[in-house]
Amino acid sequence: MVKLSLKIVFIFFLFSCSKSDDNKIELFVSGAQIAGVNGMHFGPDGLLYAASVIGSDISIIDTKTNKIIKRYDLSDGVVGPDDIAFNSKGEFYWTSILTGEVAGFNENGAKVIAGNPGPGVNPITFSDDDRLFVAQCFFDNGLFEMDPSGQTAPRIIKEEIGE
Protein backbone atom coordinates (compact mmCIF):
# COMPACT_ATOMS: atom_id res chain seq x y z
CA MET A 1 0.00 0.00 0.00
CA VAL A 2 2.85 2.39 0.84
CA LYS A 3 4.52 1.68 -2.52
CA LEU A 4 1.26 2.40 -4.32
CA SER A 5 0.83 5.66 -2.39
CA LEU A 6 4.36 6.73 -3.23
CA LYS A 7 3.80 5.92 -6.90
CA ILE A 8 0.62 7.99 -6.93
CA VAL A 9 2.39 10.92 -5.27
CA PHE A 10 5.26 10.65 -7.77
CA ILE A 11 2.90 10.54 -10.76
CA PHE A 12 0.94 13.53 -9.40
CA PHE A 13 4.21 15.43 -8.90
CA LEU A 14 5.50 14.49 -12.34
CA PHE A 15 2.35 15.62 -14.16
CA SER A 16 1.91 18.75 -12.09
CA CYS A 17 5.34 20.13 -12.97
CA SER A 18 5.20 23.19 -15.15
CA LYS A 19 7.72 25.52 -16.74
CA SER A 20 5.78 28.53 -15.48
CA ASP A 21 7.37 30.61 -12.72
CA ASP A 22 3.89 31.65 -11.54
CA ASN A 23 3.21 28.37 -9.73
CA LYS A 24 3.74 28.16 -6.00
CA ILE A 25 2.76 25.84 -3.21
CA GLU A 26 1.15 27.42 -0.19
CA LEU A 27 0.46 25.64 3.09
CA PHE A 28 -3.08 26.42 4.27
CA VAL A 29 -3.17 24.61 7.59
CA SER A 30 -0.35 23.12 9.63
CA GLY A 31 -0.63 20.80 12.58
CA ALA A 32 -4.35 20.38 12.04
CA GLN A 33 -6.29 17.48 13.42
CA ILE A 34 -7.36 16.30 9.98
CA ALA A 35 -6.91 12.57 9.55
CA GLY A 36 -6.45 12.36 5.79
CA VAL A 37 -8.62 14.28 3.34
CA ASN A 38 -10.47 12.25 0.73
CA GLY A 39 -12.57 14.91 -0.94
CA MET A 40 -12.60 18.68 -0.85
CA HIS A 41 -14.53 21.46 -2.46
CA PHE A 42 -14.71 25.23 -2.16
CA GLY A 43 -18.17 26.26 -1.04
CA PRO A 44 -20.10 29.26 -2.32
CA ASP A 45 -18.97 31.03 0.86
CA GLY A 46 -15.35 30.82 -0.37
CA LEU A 47 -14.36 28.38 2.38
CA LEU A 48 -12.69 25.03 1.76
CA TYR A 49 -14.69 21.98 2.88
CA ALA A 50 -12.50 18.91 3.48
CA ALA A 51 -14.02 15.46 4.03
CA SER A 52 -12.15 12.74 5.93
CA VAL A 53 -13.25 9.10 6.00
CA ILE A 54 -10.64 8.21 8.63
CA GLY A 55 -11.37 11.22 10.84
CA SER A 56 -15.10 10.80 10.17
CA ASP A 57 -15.53 14.55 9.87
CA ILE A 58 -15.81 17.51 7.53
CA SER A 59 -13.50 20.43 8.31
CA ILE A 60 -14.30 23.91 7.02
CA ILE A 61 -11.12 25.87 6.41
CA ASP A 62 -10.65 29.59 5.82
CA THR A 63 -7.72 29.62 3.39
CA LYS A 64 -7.13 33.34 3.98
CA THR A 65 -6.54 32.94 7.73
CA ASN A 66 -5.34 29.30 7.50
CA LYS A 67 -7.74 28.32 10.29
CA ILE A 68 -10.26 25.53 10.66
CA ILE A 69 -13.39 27.49 11.51
CA LYS A 70 -15.88 24.64 11.91
CA ARG A 71 -15.91 20.89 12.04
CA TYR A 72 -18.87 18.56 11.47
CA ASP A 73 -18.47 15.13 13.06
CA LEU A 74 -20.42 12.20 14.51
CA SER A 75 -22.26 14.51 16.92
CA ASP A 76 -23.66 16.29 13.83
CA GLY A 77 -24.54 13.02 12.08
CA VAL A 78 -21.47 12.93 9.83
CA VAL A 79 -20.08 9.39 9.51
CA GLY A 80 -17.09 8.61 7.27
CA PRO A 81 -17.52 11.32 4.62
CA ASP A 82 -15.57 10.65 1.44
CA ASP A 83 -16.54 13.18 -1.21
CA ILE A 84 -18.50 16.41 -1.03
CA ALA A 85 -20.59 18.55 -3.39
CA PHE A 86 -22.68 21.74 -3.25
CA ASN A 87 -25.99 22.57 -4.87
CA SER A 88 -26.99 26.02 -6.13
CA LYS A 89 -28.53 26.93 -2.74
CA GLY A 90 -25.19 26.39 -1.01
CA GLU A 91 -26.30 23.20 0.73
CA PHE A 92 -23.59 20.57 0.88
CA TYR A 93 -23.89 16.81 0.61
CA TRP A 94 -21.40 14.01 1.09
CA THR A 95 -21.02 10.31 0.44
CA SER A 96 -20.04 7.80 3.10
CA ILE A 97 -18.08 5.09 1.32
CA LEU A 98 -18.31 2.59 4.19
CA THR A 99 -21.99 2.92 5.15
CA GLY A 100 -23.37 3.88 1.72
CA GLU A 101 -25.20 6.89 3.11
CA VAL A 102 -25.63 10.01 0.98
CA ALA A 103 -26.51 12.95 3.22
CA GLY A 104 -26.22 16.69 3.57
CA PHE A 105 -27.22 19.75 5.51
CA ASN A 106 -30.13 21.81 4.20
CA GLU A 107 -30.43 25.61 4.25
CA ASN A 108 -31.63 25.48 7.87
CA GLY A 109 -28.63 23.40 8.96
CA ALA A 110 -30.64 20.20 9.51
CA LYS A 111 -29.17 16.90 8.34
CA VAL A 112 -31.00 15.35 5.40
CA ILE A 113 -30.44 11.75 4.30
CA ALA A 114 -30.86 11.56 0.53
CA GLY A 115 -30.64 7.76 0.57
CA ASN A 116 -28.38 4.77 0.84
CA PRO A 117 -27.51 3.07 -2.45
CA GLY A 118 -25.03 0.81 -0.61
CA PRO A 119 -21.40 0.60 0.47
CA GLY A 120 -18.80 1.99 -1.89
CA VAL A 121 -20.70 5.17 -2.74
CA ASN A 122 -17.94 7.64 -3.51
CA PRO A 123 -18.14 10.33 -6.22
CA ILE A 124 -20.92 12.89 -5.84
CA THR A 125 -21.99 15.85 -7.95
CA PHE A 126 -24.90 18.17 -8.62
CA SER A 127 -26.00 19.07 -12.14
CA ASP A 128 -26.66 22.70 -13.04
CA ASP A 129 -30.36 22.13 -12.31
CA ASP A 130 -29.58 20.67 -8.84
CA ARG A 131 -30.06 17.00 -9.68
CA LEU A 132 -27.88 14.86 -7.39
CA PHE A 133 -25.76 12.03 -8.80
CA VAL A 134 -23.53 9.50 -7.04
CA ALA A 135 -21.64 6.39 -8.06
CA GLN A 136 -20.08 3.43 -6.31
CA CYS A 137 -16.61 1.96 -6.45
CA PHE A 138 -14.76 -0.89 -4.75
CA PHE A 139 -17.76 -2.81 -3.30
CA ASP A 140 -20.23 -2.24 -6.17
CA ASN A 141 -20.17 0.02 -9.19
CA GLY A 142 -23.59 1.51 -9.86
CA LEU A 143 -24.52 5.02 -10.98
CA PHE A 144 -27.51 6.64 -9.25
CA GLU A 145 -29.63 9.76 -9.27
CA MET A 146 -30.66 10.69 -5.73
CA ASP A 147 -33.48 12.86 -4.42
CA PRO A 148 -31.63 15.37 -2.18
CA SER A 149 -34.64 15.54 0.15
CA GLY A 150 -34.73 11.75 0.53
CA GLN A 151 -38.44 11.63 -0.38
CA THR A 152 -37.94 9.12 -3.20
CA ALA A 153 -35.67 6.10 -3.47
CA PRO A 154 -32.39 6.34 -5.42
CA ARG A 155 -32.90 5.84 -9.16
CA ILE A 156 -30.47 3.37 -10.70
CA ILE A 157 -29.11 4.83 -13.92
CA LYS A 158 -26.69 1.99 -14.62
CA GLU A 159 -25.63 -1.06 -12.64
CA GLU A 160 -22.18 -2.56 -13.06
CA ILE A 161 -20.86 0.46 -14.96
CA GLY A 162 -17.35 -0.96 -14.74
CA GLU A 163 -18.14 -4.03 -16.83
Question: Which role fits each region the language model picked out?
Answer:
Residues V53, I97-L98, C137-F138:
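Short loop/turn segments immediately following the C-termini of beta-strands
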Residues G31-D45, S75-F92, E101, N116-G142, ...:
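Beta-rich, blade/repeat-based domains predominating
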Residues F15-S16:
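C-terminal motif of bacterial Sec signal peptides marking the signal peptidase cleavage site
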Residues D57-S59, E101-A103, G142-E145:
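A short loop-to-beta-strand structural motif that recurs across blades of beta-propeller domains
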Residues K24-G31, K67-L74, G109-G115, T152-E159:
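A short beta-strand motif characteristic of beta-propeller blades
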Residues V2-I11:
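Sec-dependent signal peptide recognition
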Residues D62-N66, F105-G109, M146-Q151:
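Short loop/turn segments that connect beta-strands within beta-propeller blades
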Residues S52-N66:
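Beta-propeller domains
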